[in-house]
Curated annotation (Swiss-Prot):
Entries under Pfam families matching the protein: Lipase_GDSL
Organism field: Arabidopsis thaliana (Mouse-ear cress)
CDD domains named in the record: SGNH_plant_lipase_like
GO molecular function: hydrolase activity, acting on ester bonds
Biological process according to GO: lipid catabolic process
The protein, known as: GDSL esterase/lipase At1g54020
Active site: S40 (nucleophile), D314, H317
GO cellular component, one term: vacuole
Amino acid sequence: MECSSVSVLGILLVFPLLHNLVTISGQNLPAVGLFTFGDSNFDAGNKKFLTSAPLPQNFWPYGKSRDDPKGKFSDGKIVPDFIAKFMGIPHDLPPALKPGTDVSRGASFAVGSASILGSPKDSLALNQQVRKFNQMISNWKVDYIQKSVFMISIGMEDYYNFTKNNPNAEVSAQQAFVTSVTNRFKSDINLLYSSGASKFVVHLLAPLGCLPIARQEFKTGNNCYEKLNDLAKQHNAKIGPILNEMAETKPDFQFTVFDFYNVILRRTQRNMNYRFSVTNISCCGVGTHYAYGCGLPNVHSKLCEYQRSYLYFDARHNTEKAQEAFAHLIFGADPNVIQPMNVRELMVYPVNEPMREFWEDPMDEKLSLVQY
């Protein structure tokens, strides 16, 4: 594994932070909070507080690996739960919308079906999530917010719905839509920054055309739906430059970007290298790719015998095994996966210290030396 230059920088800059530390795997890290925003990938159980309708993720087999459905779109824990553990937070990240929940070490504001441009009534768009955070902001001190980590994973719903509703969209229309989504994303990040957040972790979009639901609905068989993948790639290409610009114009703005697209693509193309036997269909559901109906009481869903051999648990969401692997990469991997620094390095990077390295195009040869 390559050693990032930012790793050395993180060691040199850690000394001012020697108070309020937690020890994780022998390493001292600041005791800060974790706040997540986005869609169903990060929803810790918020959606059930926005509707009275029965939601499939509240029922078995969701939560199967933990024998406890908690409203998460997985067979068990999700990425933020593992990140919280790595950060020394003694419990899974709680849903912010749950009345009376302990949010002292952060919370999840993410909601299933959320998008950037606008969401249905039983969800919250990204800017609505940020406004909800602002309504609760008195729970945390200003300096605590500034030192905490803010993770964002969103955009899947925007592009999936656009593709379904505009199957024959011309290239110019696709480009215009990507621009509108990313411009709004930038505005929402600015809103969160103006609320006091300064340390951001942004997930790029996965190859959306490779989701089991995309293969099933667009009838691509074993192939991915490349039109959807192209939209994801266009979106991803704009995120890094947006964040670079913000870091260059706001001295206390710090960020890193997780290359979720290529992490998923590698596991799809070379699945046995990562010990996944099945990457093109879901563990739970019905249909050609078992991509519909998981958890619905009126659907006799097929459930795989061993979910840990699957990359996807349901139509759009990864298994707990995959989510844990992603969390390890986010927290401690090299720039081949997350750049310009990982979350461990971001945690110890001094507040108000300008960034010295920025996001680079992952097609750059030097970022392609190691595969994760």
